[in-house]
């Protein structure tokens, strides 16, 4: 017998896919997207996995919509490919028989002499055996990457999961699983545990999409996260064999990544190691503390929650209310709050001047310089403070309308305007006092804000004190549930109903403050809205009504081009409905907007 002869054993034939053409086309689309560096290749891969599991033949792409991960786009592509296939091969061309022929050819076993294909395959096998095996990338236990993978995986397992998480939400949820801080770097360094997310994206374990960023697991990341989760909770989903006979996960990094990981993690701040008991209710065997620092903090299908008695209601004061301008006047407010024994915290607020948060109570850890960072949920009350001179200035420069619009869009259900009338000071301003009073009334009647009038900073402090006491009593027996900014409720009635039922859904402070950033990266639609609101007479409701019909400047200009006459162009937007009363935008504003975007010379 020749020395190079290979004995071939029996091979169990794999079941053939009944839709080989669809499988072939999806594979081509996936490979093409991967070559171009497009993230859509993950979508095609999911569709391929679903198609392989489906045992029945499909007549067209429309029928494939019943499968998981098949949307309108993929079904339309398959139908187009199928029509092209029929045009090239005739309407009677076989669609479901190719796989059976391929299976017959693949099942034919060579006898005696080996074909060229077999020899080439043997050479490739020897080459692969001789090559050094590349180690699989697995993040170190309780590192930033490890915590992010586990958090995304456990979030996907929850009922009603969106399948993705925002950055602030992900940092908050992943912190108990990580020994390093996701937000505070070590002294003298700029790196945090969040630095490892770029490595996860580079290794194609995590996908970052949209703006604000959404993070989700790829198929490869899902497989790795499932393995890490089974190791963490001590429940194996599959046996992992090793030479020592132990069921372990290989936590060895690739050689090219070892230096990168060491450089990143060596510069991070050591934080408290909290147990992993949120998603499964199980304690980690490797937990160095033995008990949870946040035992009253639980997890629900919507996210984590704060139980009654596990949090404090704290007033948050914007940094601008304590610094700059008239320091004597601003310090007077702080001193009054201290005199009234109000628990408050001065911080940067991206919208509003005062709000309240429910801050989790945490126990200091012996040996740690800083106590663990408690979770915070924002209550549905936010206050914008206005002195008469400030109100006058904001009306002149246009900030007044913009501030009201941003307060409506911030996600909190009960905005309040706190107006300091300051005696007769309004009589000496550049805008008549009657105009200022009318602006205040419009804020209450038209915009639906609650308006509180006071005389000076001392009365403002008294009102803040009363509100703090009221909210402490209102929420003292409530279970507070964390919700995403995108899952805003229906308004004030829902909030009161939930409080009456001793539960309330609130936003995390980090997510709220990040979503209210004024100068963050904006979409074309948002920039268009801001442009419209600079026009005299265009409110937020009117701008939103225009955006419903024309979301960008380009779409509006295209609509103007389709008009047959100048008069028709000027009246294009006049019949657009806005607001609750569904009033028309009117010919005057319609003509002004047309002149702004279509007049080449100076406006008349």
Curated annotation (Swiss-Prot):
Domain of life: Eukaryota
Group of enzyme by EC: hydrolase
Gene Ontology terms describing biological process: DNA catabolic process; double-strand break repair via break-induced replication; mitotic intra-S DNA damage checkpoint signaling; resolution of meiotic recombination intermediates
Molecular function via GO: 3'-flap endonuclease activity; crossover junction DNA endonuclease activity; DNA binding; metal ion binding
UniProt binding sites for Mg(2+) 1: 318, 321, 353, 384
Residues at the catalytic site: 318, 321, 353
Function, as annotated: Catalytic subunit of two functionally distinct, structure-specific, heterodimeric DNA endonucleases MUS81-EME1 and MUS81-EME2 that are involved in the maintenance of genome stability. Both endonucleases have essentially the same substrate specificity though MUS81-EME2 is more active than its MUS81-EME1 counterpart. Both cleave 3'-flaps and nicked Holliday junctions, and exhibit limited endonuclease activity with 5' flaps and nicked double-stranded DNAs. MUS81-EME2 which is active during the replication of DNA is more specifically involved in replication fork processing.
Record's protein name: Structure-specific endonuclease subunit MUS81
The organism of origin for this protein: Danio rerio (Zebrafish)
